[in-house]
Structures are given as C-alpha cells and as structure tokens.
Amino acid sequence: MRLIIRPTYEDISKWAANHVAQKIKEFSPTREKPFILGLPTGSSPIGMYKNLIKLYKDEKISFQNVITFNMDEYIGIEKNHPESYHSFMWKNFFSHIDIKKENINILNGNALNLKKECEEYEKKIKSFGGIMLFVGGIGPDGHIAFNEPGSSLTSRTRIKTLTQDTIIANSRFFEGNVNKVPKSALTVGVGTIMDSQEILIIVNGHNKARALKHAIEKGVNHMWTISALQLHKNTIIVSDKKATYELKIGTVEYFNDIERENFNNDLK
C-alpha cells in the first residue's frame, strides 16, 4: 500500500486527477480496447472531477473510449432526483466531458428486481475483464462505497442497509433532514473493489483521521472495511495533511520519504 500525503485538499484533488488521466493515457484506449474506470460520489472526489474536467478542456485527456462503473446508488429515489448519484455524476463530471452515454454504468436503485440488478452489474464488470482503476473515498467510520462496518470483506454488489452514522453524514445533502435520506442503497462489494487492478482512495479532513489510521496502521478488520485494501497488491491512498493527524510521526515521515519523488505527477 502506498500513501501520498499532500498539504491540502486542492493538492490531493489535483494529484488524483493527474493519476487517473495518466493511467488512461498510458493505456491508449480504443473503441475495441476501452479503459474500465470505477468512480465514486460524495464530497471527496468533487475536486478530482473538477481537475479532470480541466484536463479534458485543455485537451490533455479524452474519455471517448473510457467505460465507467459507479460504486453505488440509493434505493427508492428517481434517477433525476437532485441527490441521486446519477444526478451527481452528470452534474459534477459526465456533462462536462466527452464520455459516451452508453459507456456510463450506474446501479438502478429503482429496478423491479434489485437482486438481479446487482448480479447483472457484476456480470457486466466481468464481461469487460474487470475494473482497471477503481477510485473511491472513505467515510469517518472507514466504510468504502456503502460497505458499512461489519460488511464481509469478500462481499459482492448487493443491497445494503445504511447505518445511522452514514444517514446523518449524508443528511447534509438532503437539507439537513435525516428523514429524507434513503435508508438503503445498492453498492459494489469489498470483494468487487478488491478485484480491480488498481485502487486509488482519496482521504481528506480531520474527521477521516481515525479511519486512515485503521487503514494504514491497524490490522485488517471487517469493522473498518477500508482496512481490506492492505491485502490488495496495488493500492494508493492520497491524503491531505489534516487526515494524517492520528498517524504516528514515524509513519508519516516514512511515507513522505519513500514517496517524495512522486509528489509532483503533473501530466507531461
């Protein structure tokens, strides 16, 4: 596991965007050989999306031959609801780039058969040979996607009941009203994410410091699903300084030392 520590949220957003863009460029995707990208929602990736949009507008990257799979979607709200993850992705990313609509995959939280929807999502990911790069964030309790504490670390895409902590945290998107937040969602599983060739996690803010400590310094534990990534062969966590405040000084110095030459990853 790699840990890239940068001073601010703006710095890690730029670093994450550059990393995603570089991976796509290195792959040189075509219509017959697309790049398969896993994407998150929430507040953590917004800065990354803004930077990716800028790279696209500066003609440094194209998404025409990129196929995306999103991590999750609420159950019971329409796609055009302002707080659905369909709406989030179109507002913050898809409508600003050249991605083809048919290349966008987001779980349908209103499918008639939700179990079948999850099974078909897994099959579609596998049909493309799996996710090449899965980008994500984490919650204060260490959850990744909607894999709440206690989730199986081998779980697949499924229906998941949200914890009260997650509902409260997400109420900021629903006028601060916890009663308006959906109580369940469809989510890729920890196992689904672990099958990806590479994982990039964005961590920012004081409230994520405890989760980052469990991700980096503690053992693998299903109560902190982010910790499963310790077992992945190619995971990068990019974190701002605030999120490192519970890490040991030695841990921070170690990663700063070995990653020093990777702090600047601007596209050539």
UniProtKB/Swiss-Prot annotation:
Protein keywords: Allosteric enzyme, Carbohydrate metabolism, Hydrolase
Report if keyword Methyltransferase is assigned: no
Give the InterPro entries listed for this entry.
Answer: Glc/Gal-6P_isomerase, Glucosamine6P_isomerase, Glucosamine6P_isomerase_CS, NagB/RpiA_transferase-like
Tell me the SUPFAM superfamilies matching this sequence. NagB/RpiA/CoA transferase-like (SSF100950)
Where are the coiled-coil regions? none
Pathway per the UniProt entry: Amino-sugar metabolism; N-acetylneuraminate degradation; D-fructose 6-phosphate from N-acetylneuraminate: step 5/5
The protein's GO terms of the molecular function aspect are: glucosamine-6-phosphate deaminase activity; identical protein binding
Name-wise, this protein is Glucosamine-6-phosphate deaminase
Q: Which organism was this protein described from?
A: Borrelia garinii subsp. bavariensis (strain ATCC BAA-2496 / DSM 23469 / PBi) (Borreliella bavariensis)
